[in-house]
Design a protein with these regions (language model features):
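Interdomain "pre-motor" coupling segment immediately N-terminal to P-loop NTPase/helicase cores
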Residues: 1-36
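Conserved adenine-nucleotide phosphate-binding loops and their immediately adjacent elements
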Residues: 36-48
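Pre-Walker A adenine-sensing motif
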Residues: 50-64
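Walker A (P-loop) ATP-phosphate-binding motif of ABC ATPase nucleotide-binding domains
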Residues: 68
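Hydrophobic anchor at the beta1->P-loop junction of P-loop NTPases
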Residues: 71-73
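Conserved glycine(s) of the Walker
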Residues: 78
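Conserved P-loop
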Residues: 81-150
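Conserved RecA-like ASCE ATPase "motif II neighborhood" in helicase/translocase motors
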Residues: 150-171
Length: 173
């Protein structure tokens, strides 16, 4: 805890950035340029799914090789879509028993009570990007069946405290 109280210096940050770029950026850039990412094909309805940029290649590799992966980037870079694709792949391979999609149910300064309807109707607009990715990767009918069986679950972040999430692929978007 003592180290947490000490502020980071500019040199520490620079060294960290250099180390990160040497570890993940350079190999991913070469692989993406060659068109060979070394990634096995993801099992989804889309057969052409792969990382299109060096960062996407590194992101997919990190998701498939680590238990926890953080994806940070601007809107439209594929963070949610690629994470959902990896979750669908893990479910199809029986590596996980369910997919739990979590998203904050409100925008900054809003409250759920302001929207009409029950909880599902209130959070639905905020979860639309996750639904869109699922429908594209699995098809509407299959997604509907998996929702009925609670193999795929969508939950607001506020309701996740105290949950047991064994054998689950969790995407916090």
């Amino acid at each position: 805890y003592a180290a947490a109280e000490k502020p980071l210096s500019v040199d520490d940050i620079q060294l960290g950035l250099v180390e990160i770029s040497q570890r993940s950026g350079a190999p991913a850039a070469k692989e993406a340029a060659d068109g060979d990412t070394g990634m096995p094909a993801l099992r989804t309805r889309r057969t052409d799914l792969h990382g299109r940029t060096p960062n996407q290649v590194a992101y997919l590799r990190d998701i498939t090789t680590h238990d926890i992966t953080f994806g940070i980037g601007p809107a439209g870079t594929g963070k949610t879509y690629l994470a959902v694709a990896c979750a669908v792949d893990a479910l199809e391979r029986d590596a996980v028993k369910r997919i739990v999609l979590v998203r904050p149910a409100v925008e900054a300064g809003e409250r759920l009570g302001f929207l009409p309807g029950d909880l599902a109707q209130k959070v639905d607009p905020y979860l639309r990007p996750l639904y869109d990715a699922l429908y594209d990767l699995m098809g509407f009918d299959k997604v509907a069946k998996l929702f009925e069986r609670t193999t795929i679950e969508v939950a607001p972040l506020a309701y996740m405290r105290g949950r047991t999430l064994n054998h689950s692929f969790i995407i916090l978007d």
